[in-house]
């Protein structure tokens, strides 16, 4: 039944969140709010890497569940979108005198939610704050900026591709003025890609000669 599928999904995702050190805040329908850094933290960078690693494992697990459900005749298996942001939030017991919940609040939570809704299906979308913390270990593709209520500037986003050291098809480097992101699995014409890189090199060389 639909209820059994959702329960199985939430159970599997919760187990993965706990494995990576995440704190499960709440379930909202078939969505899960997870945060890192409280009550224990490994530091901003490691917390961010753990969170993205958790998200990648969640999508892998969901894919295997989807295969199982299809074999059982489920026509429309579950899909997921994941949004991740790193920032300052308030964590504690909030609520009324009769009922308190240990939860996280703040603009960062709203931004993560906006990233989730802006993500493509079965993809992970990061804010630039998270990307800057994980870019040495996680390959990402630069995506469009999004406007978020309560934030006065467009938020640059990045889509997760995989671990840099485990995926030889991915390459991503950034220096001031130059951002290079390569995914060999998506290149259909190597000659066109080589020509593009050659044109960029010519422009760089010509600027040095001026």
Model-derived regions: residue spans:
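A secondary-structure boundary/capping signal
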Residues: 28, 85-87, 126-127
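Alpha-helical scaffold within the catalytic cores of cyclic-nucleotide enzymes
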Residues: 7-22, 38-82, 86, 107-109, ...
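A short pre-motif secondary-structure segment
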Residues: 24-26
